[in-house]
Structure formats: C-alpha cells, structure tokens
Amino acid sequence: MAQGKGFGFGLGKIKELQEAFQKAQQVQEGAKQLQDELEQMSIEGHSSDGSVTVVMSGNQEPRSVTIQPTALEKGAEELSTLVTEAMKDAYSKSTDTMRQKMEELTSGLNLPGL
C-alpha cells in the first residue's frame, strides 16, 4: 500500500505559518499603540492666508477651529472657503502622518502587498 503525502505541510511550511502569525501579532500590537499615539496628536491646518486654523487628531477627528477677526470681515462665502482650505490642509497633514506611521509600523515585516 502506498504511503499518503499528508496535507502537504512540511516542517518548513509550519515554520512559515508560525512566522506569519508572529508578524500578525506584532502588527496588531503596533496598530493599537499607533491608534493611541495618533489620537493624542494635534495636527494644524491653515487657510491660504493664515486667518483660519483647524486642529485635528492624527485620526482625523476635528478638535478646534480658530478664526481671526480679519477672516470674519471677508463675508460668509469667503469665510467658508477659508475654513474649507484649513480643513483640507489639516486632513492632508493628518493622513500623511498616519500613512508615514503605518509604513514605520510595517517596515521590516516583509508583508506582501504593503
């Protein structure tokens, strides 16, 4: 009677699987720390003329908006534009920071697709 080949899992495959689980655990632990770190950050965005400042967390949670009196004098439509500019700037900086931190977290782990 011929011997079966089993499931095709040799010792090498088991070791690879263990390494993959360890990497996943490292990423999970690092992601939790990163989430906490991003939550504590305050990232500022500014309008083109600097009269409006928006502060967001590293997780893109809005924290505050500061509007200089000169911006109020420009009227509702211009003020809306300035607030939008500041929000976009803060959001862009926040997502760039998050992306950079994620790259730091996953660098050296040799994860496919990252």
Swiss-Prot record:
| GO cellular component annotations of the record | bacterial nucleoid; cytosol
Q: Example GO molecular function term?
A: DNA binding
**In terms of one coarse class, where is the protein primarily found?**
cytoplasm
Q: Does this UniProt record's set of keywords contain DNA-binding?
A: yes
Subcellular localization is given as: Cytoplasm, Nucleoid
Q: What keywords are assigned to this protein?
A: Cytoplasm, DNA-binding
Which Pfam families does the annotation name? YbaB_DNA_bd
Is Transcription among the key words of this record?
no
| Domain of life of the native organism | Bacteria
Spell out the family assignment given in the record's similarity comment. Answer: Belongs to the YbaB/EbfC family.
Q: How does it assemble?
A: Homodimer.
Report the protein's function. Answer: Binds to DNA and alters its conformation. May be involved in regulation of gene expression, nucleoid organization and DNA protection.
PANTHER family recorded: NUCLEOID-ASSOCIATED PROTEIN YBAB
Q: Could you identify this protein by its name?
A: Nucleoid-associated protein PCC7424_2224
User: Which species is listed as the source?
Assistant: Gloeothece citriformis (strain PCC 7424)
